[in-house]
Amino acid sequence: MSRTYEVAVKYILDIPRFTKKNDLVHTKTFLRYLGDPQEDLKILHVAGTNGKGSVCAYLDAMLRAEGKHTGLFTSPHLVRMNERIVLDGRQIGDESFCQVFEEVLSKVREMQEAGMPHPTFFEFLFGMAMLAFQKAGVEYAVVETGLGGRLDATNAAEHPLVTVITSIGMDHMEYLGDTIGKIAGEKAGIIRPGVPVFYAQTCEESDRVIRQTTENRHCFCKKIGKDAYEILGIEDKHIAFSCANAYYGNTTWKLNNIGVYQPGNALLAMESMRFLFGETGHPKLWRQALAEVKWGGRMEEILPDVYVDGAHNISAVEAFAQSVPESAEGNIILFSAVRDKEYTEMIACLCRNVQADLYVVAQIGDDRGAGASALGKVFEEHTDKPVIVRESVKDAFRYVLEHQKGRAVYCLGSLYLTGEIKGLIQEVKQKC
């Protein structure tokens, strides 16, 4: 990693220290200073509470299978910032990252000289992604919202080809509202007049909000319900499913994942592709592409029988629990969370629904991390199984590996936890 790259990353990480939230007028002005690179892209805009990253990865893979040049913008990153900007399936290189950073920073300086505020952390990276995509000749850009949708910086891209809304749950309530309906309203804020909408069935309240928004904005709208596909089984750590749809034929689809929630995410992406390409599309190529997708931090096997899952809200933990297979040997849970999440409910759900005979807790390295002892006490209130408290993720991860003994290990509760664990493994690999 070059010194220049380190300096660029440090600058971006320091942005929250001297900026505040800007409105969409500011984001549009920022993009205008960059030459409005988003206007040269065919954008697929994705919002939702859970599953956004997976849907984006599936869309990107199928677009590439169609021979399209793609850009993928997602957040957060788990280990390196480059993960957020992907060109034709490859993370942007350090050199290209630095080149785009310098171009964006130069325009930011011009904005500041004109009396305008500095872009936020997320705005800056969004601008970098749009410029990187334009410079690379990207045709289709898959863009994931950062938080919510209505006021999200990505909503400054005003002309998407299609809008996708994944499952909606209770998360970020301090910003998005304290009911499913309010949160759905924020997510539905990315819906543009006349732009087709595909959304995942969640509950009647969120469905009603999305349907009403599409009616008001005269959009084609399609709901992807759980009755639209059938899970056929899990074999060799792949999940197989079929679709109740003649377009796909009598075909079995496979995903390189054991999460029972992933077929719904895949079908949401598939139906969006079907709308875009119709009879000119190649579902057989999509099938091959989907089977090869590995999306980090979602039931991702990082070592033999060791999985990380970014579930960090109650609905995601419920979906995770449904995906854990029964095991005669038992399972080990490694858990951590940030203080402002409803971790008590998450822990109660785990203890109630997952067969585990050992729980290990730790405090993540981020300042927002919940204390390990506090997490341990909550587990002890909900289980009579052993609860081991370790102050650092590194010590906790070492402990579960030493005590695995043929059992599956599942690490969840925070994307910060997922990133720390993946970072530890990368460090070991680099030393070998």
Q: What are these model-derived regions, one by one?
A:
Residues 59-64, 133, 379, 425:
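Hydrophobic alpha-helical packing residues
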